Structure formats: C-alpha cells, structure tokens
Amino acid sequence: MREYSSRPIKQMNAAWLVGQYNVRMTTITPAEVRFEGGVLRAPAFDDVYHSADGGIAQSTNVFLSGNALPERWLNQLSFQILETGFGIGLNFLVAWNAWRNTVHNPDARLHFVSLEKFPLNHADLTQVLAPYTTLSPLSEALLVAWPPLVAGFHQLKFEEGRVTLTLILGDIQETLPQLTMAADAIFLDGFSPEKNPQMWDDWVIRHLARQTMYRGTLATWCVAGAVRRCLEAHGFTVQRRPGFGRKRERLEGRFDRIPEDAFRRMVTTSRNPVLARIYHQPVAPRRAMIIGAGVAGCLMAERLAQQGWQIDLFDRHAGPAEEASGNPAGILRPVLSRDDNLASRLGRAAFFQTLQTLQRLQARTGTIRHKQSGVLVLAQDETQAALQRNVIGHHGYPQDYVRFLEPDEAQTLSGIAVNWGCWYFPQGGWLDPGSLCAAALSAGAARIQSHWQTPVARIEKTGSWRVLDARGQCLAEAPILILALGAHAENLPQTAELTITLFRGQITQIAHDPFPPQTPVLCQDGYVIPGLESGLCIGATYDNDLEAEPRHASTLENMERLKRLVPDWAPDLLPTMDRVGFRSVCRDRMPLVGALSPEDGLYSVMGMGSRGLIWSSMAAELIAAELAGTPLPLEKDLIRAISPGRFSDSGVRPHADASSA
C-alpha cells in the first residue's frame, strides 16, 4: 500500500539520523606484532602466529591436509571454509593458492569466512606478508582489498568473483552467532587455549557446529583435552594425527556423530537458510526474472548472471535508470550514529560492498562515471560539531574510514568557508547511477535478456512464476522472480501490503562549476556535488506529493541550500535544469530486501529511499547468496532488519495468482 506521510519532514529526518535500534558496538583494536627469532609474535597474548618450522608449511600440513584438501573440492562447484582467527592471512592465502592451482572449472567458487578480533593494520600486514614471496601475487591482491578496520562483515572478492573472503571483524562471542553458512571445512586456529580461552570454549564449538555441513571436516593444531571433549559433545568425531614440526600431535574431525536424518531435522528448525537450501530445496533451473531496471534491478541481474543464471529483465522504459536512478549523480557515503544503530551498520557494510562492486565493474567495463573525491558532512552549528566529534571518538573509527576535520582543515580541503568543522569520508564521492546500470548490464550481457518498453501488468505462480502483460499474454516464466519496482510497488497485489511511502525529490543543476577540481562532495541539510561534466548538482527536496514536473519553488529551495554552503558564490550561479524523481521509503527507513515468499521463490529489492546507490549492491549480494546457498554477507540481525516480513509475525504471504490493482 502506498502512503503519503503526514509527519513533518524535519521530524522524519531526525528519526533517520538517530535510528530506532540500539546495538552493541565493538571498537576494533589493531593487533600489535613483533618478530622474535624470526617468528611473528602477538605480545598481548604472549603467543606466536605460526609455527617456527614455517607458516606456509603449517597451513598446508595442518589445515589443508587435515581437511583432505585439495582433493575434496576438486569436483565441487562451491566449497565453503570457516576459520577462527584470520591472523596474518596465511591460511587463506595458502588455501586460495591451492584452489587456483587445482580447480579449473570457471563456474567453481571458493568461499572462505574468517573471524578476527585483532586484525593487523595495512602497514603491518604489508610488512609481515613480504617474506612470503611464493604467495606475492595473492598477498598483493589482498592488500589492495584490505578494508578499513571497522566492525562487521567485509566481503572481498578475487579472481573475478571466483574466490570470496568474508572477513568478520569483532569479538567471536558477538560475531559467530551472526554468521549464516554451511561449512565444508573448518580451520580451528587462534592463539592457544591457555592464552585465549574464549576462542575455544564450549559456546564457540556449539556455534561452529551449527554452521557445519553434515560430514563437514575440521582440523586444528590444538589437542587439548577440553577442546577435544567439546568437539565430541557437539557432534564431531575427532582423531589425533601426527603433528607438524615440533608439535607432536594435531586433531582432525568430522561432523557425523549424529544420524543424517537427525541432522536434516535439525536443519529444518535451525533457521539457517544456507543449510536449508542445500538440504531441502531441489535444484531448479537457474533462471530468474527481474522487474525494474534501476540500480537495484540492474545490479541484481549482473550478480546472478555472473553466477551462471539466465536473466529476463523487464522495464516499462526504453532503457535502464529512467526514474529515480536517472539523476546525473548520487552520493556514496555511509551513515554514522552515536549508538551505531542498525541503519548505521547496514550503511557501513553496504558502503564497503558498493566500493568493491564499483572497482570490479569498472575494471571490467571502464565506463562508470564516478569520482572518489571524498565527502564532507558539514556541521550546522557548534552543538552538531560536538556530536560529530563525539561519535568518532566513541567508536574509535580509523582515519581511512572517517575523521573529524576542524574548520581550517575543512576549508583547506573544500575551498569554502567552514564555520564548525565536519565529518570527512575519504573513500566517499559521487557516482552516475545510469553509468553504473549500463556497466552492470554490459558485464552480464551474455546471460541477461533485457525487455525494454515492456510493462508488467500481472504476475502469477503456476509451478514457475509467470509475468504477463495487460492483455494477459505470458512474457516469460522462471522459478525465481525478483521485484525491483521502485515507486511502482503498489501496482502488484503481491506487494500491496508492503507499506511504502513515496517522497518527491527535485534536484537542480547549474552549468557553471566554480569549485576547484578536487573539491569533495558537500553535505549539510542537502548536498552539492561538484566536478560533473554537466556542472553542479544540488539537492534534494523532500516533498509529500507526486508532482512529476519541476516547480520553481523547489528550484528556489535548492538554491537556498547552495547559498547556505557558499554564500559568496551563490548569487552569481544560475540554475539551468531541474529533474524530479520519487523515493520509495519503508516506514522504518530500512529497505525491503529478501524473500517475500521463500518457499515460492518471490524476492524483493525495494524500499531503497535515498540510499539506493549504497544499499543496492549489498541487496544483490545477499539475495544471490541465499539463492546459491553460500555464506551470507550480512549479520543475521541486519538481515532480519531488512526482511520484507519483519512487520508481521507470519511475514508477507503473497497471493499465488492475482490481477493487478
């Protein structure tokens, strides 16, 4: 049901800034490391990162051989490894190197998930990995992708997406329950139980078992009796094996102490959709239909196409990005909050995912118009400046993610007078949504069939999903249907009960751009994007009506925004063009991403509001992972927070066959 909000816009924006959810935030402290006798040590734990007899050899003998690798992955299209303790990344690099040397099927995928509380900073990791010259091409790629050290899931892709590292930063007691995967192999690593007992306790082993495939394997250098008994208590059969180097013994395990039918029943009630898909859902033809070719729909199509799906993409317009995604530029930046609420955590994860997607698609096509100019979020007064300082200090964010600039620093960077300081996001910038859509469709062109000027009037489920035109003619059918309808969610009864509010937004363009070439994007109560070929872009209004044509009052409102940011320049700048789009906003300001009806194969990537450029890439990754039965790229509570069924106990249950409203 489409709604128009009666709440004041200022009140709604304040709610969006503060957020509705309080969560626990883990500040990430980089590891302190030093070499002693040629071996890397962690002084905080008084322990070594690897055996004195060789790190690569230890990874190969203990973790690869201990899990019967590479033999077990040779005939697998997807293989999932879960590691406790990323350390310096040797286990990942050794596994990746072995996989690329033994697996030659271009459709095969390696998924490596690793949890780490104290990651190395980029400089230390560079120094530590330098001696491992046989792994240099891989370690260099890892260093290029190494993220800012902030809490959460960081999904890094290599080998054109054939290898995925999900690096989870935070305390294992907080992060492991948030993970959803089906591990074929576990690398049980970490500092010794005497030095770091919480990495090896009963609670951790129990949660590892919940993420493991039936007959999945486990390997560790640790043979402590308490660890062995925990593993056996939670379903693993374990055996001692000859150890590596000076270590006399090691352990190998297999998750098979319960009957397989009992495991299947456990999967049914475990709420682990990855295990459930692998064990209970028949393999269907990898065909999907997507309705809507804005940013969300195009990125969804590309992600599935890269995983081997055949896609039919429908849109009522003559090409992609004709509605809200048709603005000349949008802003790339995360959202911060004092309590690190769900919106902030989702925005952070999605921001990093979007940067990865941009890098990947730009390397493939070279056609995306985008500039990593940085983004300044300017405080409006001293009170807000104090809040900005407080947020960064409270969470201990690293400077390569965000930092607070004092007024003189901000003025030097931006070239404008700054009164109170600002947040500065150095990895932020602007992006042309239309060029992103075109690049996504180009990258997936071999498997994407685009149907332009093809409105979908109705959808129905008769075995597979079918999309029909206004005459009732079937346009295509597939087992999976994904709705990326933007402002048109009300047009189908299957989405009519999703309460979505539309907000009009008008932007204004100015042909003359007086800003220096390196000026960052400027944000306050609105934004100014400099550096475009078409000049300046200013926006955007937030209106409670559906007037599709530009209006003079909205132009004046945008010009006032410009005047507040650059009062000395604004009188000389004249508007040259305006454009109107509509944001589709859910009532809690979070998107609608996931299964509308999981047993029926109906999915949503809607309700993106003003954050479609940031959220769409993560939405595509999440749904693609759910469909493939691979590790999910988001924490469980974030997945619940964006689920279309979150507003009712029973979730959304669409009609199987219904005519359009």
Task: Mark where each language-model region is.
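Helix-loop-beta segment of a Rossmann-like dinucleotide-binding subdomain
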Residues: 136-138, 338-339, 367-377, 401, ...
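Core beta-strand elements of the Rossmann-like FAD/NAD(P) dinucleotide-binding domain
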Residues: 471-480
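Active-site substrate-recognition segment that forms the wall
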Residues: 261-283, 289-307, 316, 324-331, ...
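Helical element adjacent to the flavin cofactor pocket in flavoenzyme catalytic cores
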Residues: 423-462, 480
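C-terminal catalytic lobe of FAD-dependent flavoproteins
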Residues: 572-661
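Rossmann-like AdoMet
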Residues: 24-80, 96-134, 645
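Dinucleotide-binding Rossmann-like beta1-alpha1 core, especially the glycine-rich loop
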Residues: 331-413
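S-adenosyl-L-methionine
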Residues: 127-176
